[in-house]
Amino acid sequence: MHPHDQTIFALSSGRPPSAIAIVRLSGVGAGPALQTLTGKLPPPRLATRALLRDDRGDPIDDAVVLWFPGPASATGEDVAELHVHGSRAVITTLVSLLSAMPQMRAADRGEFTRRAFENGKIDLTEAEGLDDLIHADTDRQRRQALRQLKGLLGDKARSWRDQIIQAAALIEAGIDFADEGDVPAELIAPALAWIRQLLAEIEEVLAAQGRAERLRDGLTVVIAGPPNAGKSTLMNQLARREVAIVSPHAGTTRDLIEVALDLDGYPVTVIDTAGIRQTDDPVEQEGVRRARDRAAQADLVLWLTEDDQAELERQTDGPIWFVRNKIDLMITEQSGAISVSPESPVFAISARSGAGMSDLLEALVGFARDYFGATEHGLITRERQRTWLSETAAALRRSIAAVDLGEELAAEELRIAALALGRLLGRVDVEDLLDVIFREFCIGK
């Protein structure tokens, strides 16, 4: 971990060339750097046009600069932004000048956000929400990440923690009274009622069955089947572009091909696999092995043709939909859903002409809707969050059971519950975890 007496900088926009590039700075050297480049500090929080100059006084670029004195800034430190033209030459010159300034260095991944966290601008759940927002592929993922970034889980966790501490204070006050006789019931009874109410609220959040986590991770659909069944053609139809090579020769697909889709706002990853068959070709054998492995891990398998159904069913516990392809070559075949069995529906399509695809797509959207559920009520988006909420709930249960054994035990369990929520928020004993979380961010964020 780098010391905070160093000022960090990074290109926060996309790769050049581009219309505009944004270079961010954070730390005690942000103001002096801005002064060196522009000749003076601009008014705080006001976009100001300025000519940037190098150390010889030669112009670099005509820019828009912003100055945010800390602590009223995104990171809690002095922050500057340089909005320049996004040419490689401008950015290279600017980065070279900044690198040569004293106590100035390039930022690590997620370091701006980490400084915001360490300066109390955001908690860890909000930082995770920001990471999810950056990586959101669909509108539903965006809305969920934004709820997290706005502190939906963090605010609840802080409220729960404060109430647990107050309940513990009531019990500990009762312990103090016990030195003079029995523990007053008027202290213990409301504390217990408070704890039970908190436990019910946390258990309700935990009972959401990981819906928000599912939305963050997405749904995986594997297209499997024998060689030359039209799997790659179906993949291209679903993606509405050519992502897989289509050939009349069997065994064209040797490796897994993945494409991310947005189905009515739901994130779906579709995977095209090698044709499953017996073969002596070692390369194709590896492709078949990977196909079987991915089918076993999939949330849904689309099996083209009905050959080897039993063999596939033994390899996956998940749902299988059978898709009869190439109906354009079968005069009497009817397109669309030809079986409505909820366990293994059968669809008749032509991946080449698109016949029957609307029914298959409609069914996929319905499957995704059921799979993700009512995600707008989900608060937990990561296993880490679920772990600490589960620890909190377990400690609250133990505190209720411990009251009859001794108020000291109940108070200790409440301290454990408050500690777990502190870890959820990133305020207690999480130093080792921070490197892992912020490493997922991009440079400049």
UniProtKB/Swiss-Prot annotation:
InterPro entries: G_TrmE (IPR031168), GTP-bd (IPR006073), GTP-bd_TrmE_N (IPR018948), GTPase_MnmE (IPR004520), MnmE_dom2 (IPR027368), MnmE_helical (IPR025867), P-loop_NTPase (IPR027417), Small_GTP-bd (IPR005225). GO terms for cellular component: cytoplasm. Its main location: cytoplasm. It is found in: Cytoplasm. Mg(2+) binds at residues 232, 253. Its cofactor is K(+). PROSITE patterns: G_TRME. CDD domains: trmE (cd04164), TrmE_N (cd14858). (6S)-5-formyl-5,6,7,8-tetrahydrofolate binds at residues 24, 81, 121, 445. GO terms for molecular function: GTP binding; GTPase activity; metal ion binding. Residues 218-369 form the TrmE-type G domain. SUPFAM superfamilies: P-loop containing nucleoside triphosphate hydrolases, TrmE connector domain. GTP binds at residues 228-233, 247-253, 272-275, 350-352. Signal peptide: none annotated. Its EC number is 3.6.-.-. Belongs to the TRAFAC class TrmE-Era-EngA-EngB-Septin-like GTPase superfamily. TrmE GTPase family. Homodimer. Heterotetramer of two MnmE and two MnmG subunits. Exhibits a very high intrinsic GTPase hydrolysis rate. Involved in the addition of a carboxymethylaminomethyl (cmnm) group at the wobble position (U34) of certain tRNAs, forming tRNA-cmnm(5)s(2)U34. This is tRNA modification GTPase MnmE. The gene is mnmE.
